[in-house]
C-alpha cells in the first residue's frame, strides 16, 4: 500500500481508514460504510480474488484512484466463512459515532477480529467438529503446546518431549490456527499447516504467561490446576490467551480453568497410527467409512465433538472405563426414550460461549430456553436408571427453572435473527416497552379514524390516508378533486394522478410514532443486554450442565450402538494381553454386503507375536486393524464388536501399515516405512500393541528380508510388545522355531482352476501358498501375462528346486531363495567337451570326477 508516505494529502475519511489499517497491517480490514463493508487498496485486490467479487475504484485520494471492493453488511457471515476457510483473518470495523452529530468522518473502531481459531459464530463453525486455536513453544528441553476451543472455553496444555510426540499432537488436535514464536527452530514441523501466525517473543515469556492466566482465573497461583510445573506449556498458553483477548476485544468469562494433558493418562498414538486406523478421517481425507462414522450417532453437536475427543484420547484409567461400561449397560433399555429428548437440547455448549462473549443472538436465547424446557423430562426419565454415574450426571445437568421462566417471559416464541430488527422481547415483559409499542402499533387505528373523519368533513370520496418510508404519513386526494382540498392541507408530494398532503395534526402524530418506534427499539436493545447480565452469573453451572448433557449423549449413543450392532462388554485384565473371541472389524462389517467372517485372536506374555501370512486380499490388514480398533474402543469405555474380549493394559498403539512417497518432504516410500519403523523400535514397550504390515517391501529382497527378520526379533525378544507381524517373506515363519512367544497364523484361500476364493478365516500355522498369480488374474492382469508368468515360475522351479514354492518342514521357502553353491564336479563337467577326448583322457576324467565327488 503506497499511501502512508503522503498521509496528509488524503481525504479525512481515507486518513481515518489508513490509521485503522496501520493497526492491522497483516489482515483484511472490513471498513463499515452505510450498508456495506468496504475494502481498499491491497485488501481490495486480495479480497476480490479470494471472494470472487468485483474490484472497482472509488474516486481519488492523494491524487490517485482508490482500488475498492465491497460486500453488503447483511451478507457478511457468508463472506467471512469463505475467508476463514481459506485461513484468512479479518478485522471488523464498525461505525460507533452518530452520523447526524459527527463533524467530519463518523467515528469508527475495530470491534472484533475474526480469525480461523477464534470464531464462535454459528455460521462459521462446523457443528460436529472442534475448532481449536493453538500455540507452540520450544526450548532445549522440549516443546510446549496449548489449545483453546473458544466456542466452549476448553483450555488444555501439554509438554511433548520430542518431535514425534509433537507431530502426533498436531495431528490429533488439528488446530484451525497455530501461533508460533518468531525464532521457532523446527519450522519443518509446522510448514504447510493452515492458519499459521508468527508472534513476537515477549508474548511467550513465562512471567507474563503466569500473570495472564492468574488474572483470567482470578487466582494467586496455578497450583490448583496442576500446571505450575509445566513452564513450556505455560509459555504457549500465555501467548494463546493474550491472542484470544486481543481478537475478541472483550472479557472471556467462559474460560474458567486450564487442564494439563499428560502422556501417561492416555494411550499414545503417533500420527501414522491415527492416519492408518482411520479414526475420524479416512486415507482420502473424507469422513466416510471411518470408526467415527460407525460409532457417532449422537443427537447433539456437542456430544459428537466429545465422542471424537474420546476416540483420539483413549484413557488408561480402568476406573473411568469401568464406570463408562456400567453406565452404557444401565442405559441400554432407555435409549429410545432419551435420544428424542436429548436431540432437542441442541448445541448448548457453543450458545453459552456466545453468551459469555456477549455475541449471542435472539435465536440463541430461544434455543437455550428450548434446552431448559427439556431438562424436567430428561431428569424424570433418568430417575429410573439404576446407575450411580447416571444419577451424578442427572444432578450435574440441573434444572434452571428460574432461567427457563425468565426466557419464556422475555423472548418471543420465534424471534428474528438480529436484535436490531426489533420484535425480540415478548409483550408483557416490560411495561414501558409495551407502551411505546402500543403507540407505534396503534397507528393503523388512528389512520383509519382520521380517514373517515376527513372524508366526512371535506366530502371528498377519493381521500385516503397512508404512509411510505420516504415521505412518512400523508393524505392523498385524486387529481380530479385536488382543487377542493381545504386550505390547511399542505402539499407534500405530487403524483401523476393524485396529490399528497400533510396537516399539522398528522405531522405531530408522525413525529410521535417515529419517536416511539426508535425508543421501543432502543429500549429493546437495552433489555436484551440486561438479559445477558441476568444469565451470566449462572455461567459456570450452565457450562457444567452442557458438559453433563454432552457426556450423557455420548453414553446413550454408545449404548444404542452396542445394542444395534451386537457389541459386547470387554473385560480388563491386569497382565498384558488381548484375547478376542469372534472379533469383527467395526467399519468393514458395516460396508460389506455379505456376512463378515469373525476371527479369534490370542496375545499374551507367552504368545507375544503372531506372524501372519496369506494371500493379498486375504484379509491380513483387516484382521490387524480390527484388533487395534477393538482395543481403542475398549479404552474409551465402549462395547466392542466381538463375542468376548479380555484386554490387558496398553500404553501405546503403533501401526506400520502401507506407505506412499512423501514427496513434500522428499522421502521415498522406503524412507517413510523405515522412519515409522524406527519410531516403533525406539518407543514401544511390553505394554504396547504393534501392527507391522509388510516390512521391507520397498528395498531388495535380501535387504528387506533381513530387516523384517531383525525387526521381528527385536520386538519379540527385547521389547516384548504385543505384535501382529504380517509378511510375504515366508522365511519369517521359521521364527516360532527359533524363539519363544512367537506363533504362526494364516488367512486361507481356495484355488479352483484360474479362480480363487478368499476364506478370510484365521487359522493356526503358516500359509501353504502365496496365490500371487491367482490374485493378479483376479485383478484383471491380461491372460497372456499370467500365462507367461506361470511358464517363468515353472522355469525357475526347475532350475532351482530349493527356490521353488514348496513346503519344507512346514515352512514355505521363498521363490528367490539363495541357490546352493555349485559343486566342483558339476563345474568340471560343465567345462568338459566329451567329443574331443581320447579313450585315455576319458578314463583319467572318470578318476578325477570320482575324487571331486
Curated annotation (Swiss-Prot):
Positions contributing to ATP binding: 614-621
SMART domains per record: MUTSac, MUTSd
Keywords: ATP-binding, DNA damage, DNA repair, DNA-binding, Nucleotide-binding
Any single GO BP term: mismatch repair
Cross-referenced InterPro entries: DNA_mismatch_repair_MutS, DNA_mismatch_repair_MutS-lik_N, DNA_mismatch_repair_MutS/MSH, DNA_mismatch_repair_MutS_C, DNA_mismatch_repair_MutS_clamp, DNA_mismatch_repair_MutS_core, DNA_mismatch_repair_MutS_N, DNA_mismatch_repair_MutS_sf
One example GO MF annotation: ATP-dependent DNA damage sensor activity
GO cellular component: cytosol
Family: Belongs to the DNA mismatch repair MutS family.
Function: This protein is involved in the repair of mismatches in DNA. It is possible that it carries out the mismatch recognition step. This protein has a weak ATPase activity.
PANTHER family associated with the record: DNA MISMATCH REPAIR PROTEIN MSH1, MITOCHONDRIAL (PTHR11361:SF34), DNA MISMATCH REPAIR PROTEIN MUTS FAMILY MEMBER (PTHR11361)
Protein name: DNA mismatch repair protein MutS
Annotated organism of origin: Escherichia coli O81 (strain ED1a)
Amino acid at each position: 500500500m503506497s499511501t502512508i508516505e503522503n498521509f496528509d494529502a488524503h481525504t479525512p475519511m481515507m486518513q481515518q481508514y489508513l490509521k485503522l489499517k496501520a493497526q492491522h497491517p497483516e489482515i483484511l480490514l472490513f471498513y463499515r460504510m452505510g450498508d456495506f463493508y468496504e475494502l481498499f487498496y491491497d485488501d481490495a485486490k486480495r479480497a476480490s480474488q479470494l471472494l470472487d467479487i468485483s474490484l472497482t475504484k472509488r474516486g481519488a485520494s492523494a491524487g490517485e484512484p482508490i482500488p475498492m471492493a465491497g460486500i453488503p453488511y447483511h451478507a457478511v457471515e457468508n463472506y467471512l466463512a469463505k475467508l476463514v476457510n481459506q485461513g484468512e483473518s479479518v478485522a471488523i470495523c464498525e461505525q460507533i459515532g452518530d452520523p447526524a452529530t459527527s463533524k467530519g468522518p463518523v467515528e469508527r473502531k475495530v470491534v472484533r477480529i475474526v480469525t480461523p481459531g477464534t470464531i464462535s459464530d454459528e455460521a462459521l463453525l462446523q457443528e460436529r467438529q472442534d475448532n481449536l486455536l493453538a500455540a507452540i513453544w520450544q526450548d532445549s528441553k522440549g516443546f510446549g503446546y496449548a489449545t483453546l476451543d473458544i466456542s466452549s472455553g476448553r483450555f488444555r496444555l501439554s509438554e511433548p518431549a520430542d518431535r514425534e510426540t509433537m507431530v502426533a499432537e498436531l495431528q490429533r488436535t488439528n488446530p484451525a490456527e497455530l501461533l508460533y514464536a518468531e525464532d521457532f527452530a523446527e519450522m519443518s514441523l509446522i510448514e504447510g499447516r493452515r492458519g499459521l501466525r508468527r508472534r513476537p517473543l515477549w508474548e511467550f515469556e513465562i512471567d507474563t504467561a503466569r500473570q495472564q492466566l492468574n488474572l483470567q482465573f482470578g487466582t494467586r497461583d496455578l497450583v490448583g490446576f496442576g500446571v505450575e510445573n509445566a513452564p513450556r506449556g505455560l509459555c504457549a498458553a500465555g501467548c494463546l490467551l493474550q491472542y484470544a483477548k486481543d481478537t475478541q476485544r472483550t472479557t472471556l468469562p467462559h474460560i474458567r480453568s486450564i487442564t494439563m494433558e499428560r502422556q501417561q493418562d492416555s494411550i499414545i498414538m503417533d500420527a501414522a497410527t491415527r492416519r492408518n486406523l482411520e479414526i475420524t478421517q479416512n486415507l482420502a481425507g473424507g469422513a466416510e467409512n471411518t470408526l467415527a462414522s460407525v460409532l457417532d450417532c449422537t443427537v447433539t453437536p456437542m456430544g459428537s465433538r466429545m465422542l471424537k475427543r474420546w476416540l483420539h484420547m483413549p484413557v488408561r484409567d480402568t476406573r473411568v472405563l469401568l464406570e463408562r461400561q456400567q453406565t452404557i449397560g444401565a442405559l441400554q433399555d432407555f435409549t429410545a426414550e432419551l435420544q428424542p429428548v436429548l436431540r432437542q437440547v441442541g448445541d448448548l455448549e457453543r450458545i453459552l460461549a456466545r453468551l459469555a462473549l456477549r455475541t449471542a443472538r435472539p435465536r440463541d436465547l430461544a434455543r437455550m430456553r428450548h434446552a431448559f424446557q427439556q431438562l424436567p423430562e430428561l431428569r424424570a426419565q433418568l430417575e429410573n436408571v439404576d446407575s450411580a454415574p447416571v444419577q451424578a450426571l442427572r444432578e450435574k445437568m440441573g434444572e434452571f427453572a428460574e432461567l427457563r421462566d425468565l426466557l419464556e417471559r422475555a423472548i418471543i416464541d420465534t424471534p428474528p435473527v438480529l436484535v436490531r430488527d426489533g420484535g425480540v422481547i415478548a409483550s408483557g415483559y416490560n411495561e414501558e416497552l409495551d407502551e411505546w409499542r402500543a403507540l407505534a402499533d396503534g397507528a393503523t387505528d388512528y389512520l383509519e379514524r382520521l380517514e373517515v373523519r376527513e372524508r366526512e368533513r371535506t366530502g371528498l370520496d377519493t381521500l385516503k390516508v397512508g404512509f411510505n418510508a420516504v415521505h412518512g404519513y400523508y393524505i392523498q386526494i385524486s387529481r380530479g378533486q385536488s382543487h377542493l382540498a381545504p386550505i390547511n392541507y399542505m402539499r407534500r408530494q405530487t403524483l401523476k394522478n393524485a396529490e399528497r398532503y400533510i396537516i399539522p395534526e398528522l405531522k405531530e402524530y408522525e413525529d410521535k410514532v417515529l419517536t416511539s418506534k426508535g425508543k421501543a427499539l432502543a429500549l429493546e436493545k437495552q433489555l436484551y443486554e440486561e438479559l445477558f447480565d441476568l444469565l451470566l452469573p449462572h455461567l459456570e453451572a450452565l457450562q457444567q450442565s452442557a458438559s453433563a448433557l454432552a457426556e450423557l449423549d455420548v453414553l446413550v449413543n454408545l449404548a444404542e450402538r452396542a445394542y444395534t450392532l451386537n457389541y459386547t462388554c470387554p473385560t480388563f485384565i491386569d497382565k498384558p494381553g488381548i484375547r478376542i473371541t469372534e472379533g469383527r472389524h467395526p467399519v468393514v462389517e458395516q460396508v460389506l454386503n455379505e456376512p463378515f467372517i469373525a476371527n479369534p485372536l490370542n496375545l499374551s506374555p507367552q504368545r507375544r507375536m503372531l506372524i501372519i501370512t496369506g494371500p493379498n486380499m486375504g484379509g491380513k490388514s483387516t484382521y490387524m486393524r480390527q484388533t487395534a480398533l477393538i482395543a481403542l474402543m475398549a479404552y474409551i469405555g465402549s462395547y466392542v464388536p466381538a463375542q468376548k474380549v479380555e484386554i490387558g493394559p496398553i500404553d501405546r498403539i503403533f501401526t506400520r501399515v502401507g506407505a506412499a512417497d512423501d514427496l513434500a518432504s522428499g522421502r521415498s516410500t522406503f524412507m517413510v516405512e523405515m522412519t515409522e519403523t524406527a519410531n516403533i523400535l525406539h518407543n514401544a514397550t511390553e505394554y504396547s500393541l504393534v501392527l507391522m504390515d509388510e516390512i521391507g517391501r520397498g528395498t531388495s529382497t535380501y535387504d528387506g528380508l533381513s530387516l523384517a527378520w531383525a525387526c521381528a526379533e527385536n520386538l519379540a525378544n527385547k521389547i516384548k510388545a504385543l505384535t501382529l507381524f504380517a509378511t510375504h517373506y515366508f522365511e519369517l515363519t521359521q521364527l516360532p522355531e527359533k524363539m519363544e512367544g512367537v506363533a504362526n497364523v494364516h488367512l486361507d484361500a481356495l484355488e479352483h482352476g484360474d479362480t480363487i476364493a478368499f476364506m478370510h478365516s484365521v487359522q493356526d500355522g503358516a500359509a501353504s501358498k502365496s496365490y500371487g498369480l491367482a490374485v493378479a488374474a483376479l485383478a484383471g492382469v491380461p491372460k497372456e501375462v499370467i500365462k507367461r508368468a506361470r511358464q517363468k515360475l515353472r522355469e525357475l522351479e526347475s532350475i532351482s528346486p530349493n527356490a521353488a514354492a514348496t513346503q519344507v518342514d512346514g515352512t514355505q521357502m521363498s521363490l528367490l531363495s539363495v541357490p546352493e553353491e555349485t559343486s566342483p564336479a558339476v563345474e568340471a563337467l560343465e567345462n568338459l567337451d566329451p567329443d574331443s577326448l581320447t579313450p585315455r583322457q576319458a578314463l583319467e576324467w572318470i578318476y578325477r570326477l570320482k575324487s571331486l565327488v
